[in-house]
Amino acid sequence: MAERGELDLTGAKQNTGVWLVKVPKYLSQQWAKASGRGEVGKLRIAKNQGRTEVSFTLNEDLANIHDIGGKPASVSAPREHPFVLQSVGGQTLTVFTESSSDKLSLEGIVVQRAECRPAASENYMKLKRLQIEESSKPVRLSQQLDKVVTTNYKPVANHQYNIEYERKKKEDGKRARADKQHVLDMLFSAFEKHQYYNLKDLVDITKQPVGYLKEILKEIGIQNVKGIHKNTWELKPEYRHYQTEEKSD
């Protein structure tokens, strides 16, 4: 971009409001496959008991996923995506576009933030399972050598990077936070195996700090406070794809 350029403030003058929406990676990849200015789906905005409900439905033509991580695959992407609406939080966020002639235009000011999430379904669970399996495959492969390795390495009690890692781990005194989407993937994968988990087991599975894990669990799960499953967590109804077991008080 040029150091000096023309700035079109039409969007600011018209007080144009825009939404800033986070979408899953697979959804943006499917959108990119749409030809020309074709339709990628439908956005529905409705009122339910005074609350705004927003959802996106992906076009059926774009639902087929043919590769995952560069590997051939055959799976259908979830079509229904409810929005989780979030406030702007006192921030002033703006959207700019840049033309081929380096002209900047202010398109509008962000008035609403949201996260577009897939509705829990068999298709979504299958897609996440394939993604998790692909990401867990080793990137290094064993190879048979034709020649004898002549380089001599002396054994050491511990490597320097291991020493540094252990030192940092002791200094931190806590687990490092992983990406939120990665934690969600691990949780959904765990809840495919069992309906109920106590917090300690979920901490062991995800290797996440307790406070951070509980923040994420509150978005997708329910903590049981009574009955035979007291003090355990399970998925909220909208994220389940199994038959709910009967609870007793």
Curated annotation (Swiss-Prot):
InterPro entries recorded: TFIIF_beta, TFIIF_beta_HTH, TFIIF_beta_N, TFIIF_interaction, WH-like_DNA-bd_sf, WH_DNA-bd_sf
CDD domains on file: TFIIF_beta (cd07980)
Chain positions found as N-acetylalanine: A2
Keyword Cell wall biogenesis/degradation: no
Residue ranges of the TM segments: none
Domain of life: Eukaryota
Subcellular location: Nucleus
Example GO molecular function: DNA binding
N6-acetyllysine modifications at: K22, K33, K137
Gene Ontology CC entries for this record: microtubule cytoskeleton; transcription factor TFIIF complex
Pfam families with a match to the protein in the record: TFIIF_beta, TFIIF_beta_N
Residues bearing PTM Phosphoserine: S142, S248
Main location: nucleus
Described purpose of this protein according to its UniProt entry: TFIIF is a general transcription initiation factor that binds to RNA polymerase II and helps to recruit it to the initiation complex in collaboration with TFIIB.
Protein name per its UniProtKB record: General transcription factor IIF subunit 2
Provenance organism: Mus musculus
